[in-house]
C-alpha cells in the first residue's frame, strides 16, 4: 500500500512538472507534437546543420516533433506554409501521424528488411544529415540497457558511414553511464569533429545527452 502511495506521489510530481514545463508550453504554442523539438533546434542553431535543399533522415521519429522542426527548417525563405525544399525521410517502429512532405516508414531499424526499405527510399542519394532519437525499451538494468542503446547507435553510425556525404553529420541521443565513453570513442573513430551536447530542453534530472559527429573520416 505504501509503495502504491509513493508511486502516485511520483506520478503526480511528474505531471506537475510536465504541465508547468516551459518547453511543453512552447511546443503547444508553436504546434510541435513534443518538447523534444527544442533539443534538436538548439543543436541545429548551435552548429548550423540543417538547410533547405538537403536530404535528411530522421530515425526514431515518432511522434514527429523532430520531423516537424526539420520540415520547417528545410522550407525555402518566404515559402508558403507546408512547402518543402529537400527530402525528409522518417522512420520509427511506432506509427506516426502524417506530416506534409515527409516520407514515413514504419518498422524496426534493427531488421534487415526495414533497413532495405529505408535505403530504397534514400535512392542512393548522398544524405546531408542523419538524426536519431532512437531509444530501446529500458529494462532498468543498467548493463542490459547500455548494450541495447549502444547497438542502436552503432547501427546509426553504420548507416551514416554508408549514406552520408563526406561533410555530412550524424546526431544521436544517448545516456551518460555505462558504455558512454566507448560510444564517444566510436564517434571519434568515424568523424573528424565530435561534439557532446546537452540542450537546455533536456531535463536536468535526466542523464540524456546527444553526440554530434561531423565530417566522415576516410
UniProtKB/Swiss-Prot annotation:
Principal EC category:
transferase
Keywords assigned:
Cytoplasm, Methyltransferase, rRNA processing, S-adenosyl-L-methionine, Transferase
List the Gene Ontology MF annotations in alphabetical order.
rRNA (uridine-2'-O-)-methyltransferase activity
Show the catalytic activity. Answer: uridine(2552) in 23S rRNA + S-adenosyl-L-methionine = 2'-O-methyluridine(2552) in 23S rRNA + S-adenosyl-L-homocysteine + H(+)
Where is it found, in Gene Ontology cellular component terms? cytoplasm
Query: Which amino acid positions bind S-adenosyl-L-methionine, per UniProt?
Result: 64, 66, 92, 108, 133
Q: Which domain of life is it from?
A: Bacteria
UniProt function note: Specifically methylates the uridine in position 2552 of 23S rRNA at the 2'-O position of the ribose in the fully assembled 50S ribosomal subunit.
Name of the protein described by the UniProt record: Ribosomal RNA large subunit methyltransferase E
Q: Which organism is this protein's natural source? A: Paracidovorax citrulli (strain AAC00-1)
Q: What is the lineage of its organism?
A: Bacteria, Pseudomonadati, Pseudomonadota, Betaproteobacteria, Burkholderiales
Q: Source gene?
A: rlmE
Amino acid at each position: 500500500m505504501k509503495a502504491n502511495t509513493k508511486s502516485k506521489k511520483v506520478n503526480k510530481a511528474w505531471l506537475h512538472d510536465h504541465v508547468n514545463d516551459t518547453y511543453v508550453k512552447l511546443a503547444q504554442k508553436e504546434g510541435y507534437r513534443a518538447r523534444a523539438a527544442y533539443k534538436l533546434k538548439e543543436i541545429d542553431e548551435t552548429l548550423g546543420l540543417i538547410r533547405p535543399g538537403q536530404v535528411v533522415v530522421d530515425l526514431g521519429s515518432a511522434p514527429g516533433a523532430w520531423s516537424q522542426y526539420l520540415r520547417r527548417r528545410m522550407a525555402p525563405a518566404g515559402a508558403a506554409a507546408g512547402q518543402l525544399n529537400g527530402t525528409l525521410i522518417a522512420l520509427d517502429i511506432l506509427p506516426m501521424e502524417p506530416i506534409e512532405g515527409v516520407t514515413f516508414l514504419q518498422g524496426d531499424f534493427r531488421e534487415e528488411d526495414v533497413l532495405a526499405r529505408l535505403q530504397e527510399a534514400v535512392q542512393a542519394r548522398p544524405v546531408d544529415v542523419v538524426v536519431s532519437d532512437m531509444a530501446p525499451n529500458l529494462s532498468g538494468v543498467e548493463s542490459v540497457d547500455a548494450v541495447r542503446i549502444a547497438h542502436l547507435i552503432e547501427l546509426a553510425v553504420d548507416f551514416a558511414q554508408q549514406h552520408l556525404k563526406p561533410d555530412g553529420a550524424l546526431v544521436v541521443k544517448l545516456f551518460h553511464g555505462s558504455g558512454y565513453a566507448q560510444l564517444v570513442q566510436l564517434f571519434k573513430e568515424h568523424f573528424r569533429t565530435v561534439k557532446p551536447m546537452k540542450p537546455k530542453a533536456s531535463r536536468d534530472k535526466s542523464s540524456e545527452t546527444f553526440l554530434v559527429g561531423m565530417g566522415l573520416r576516410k
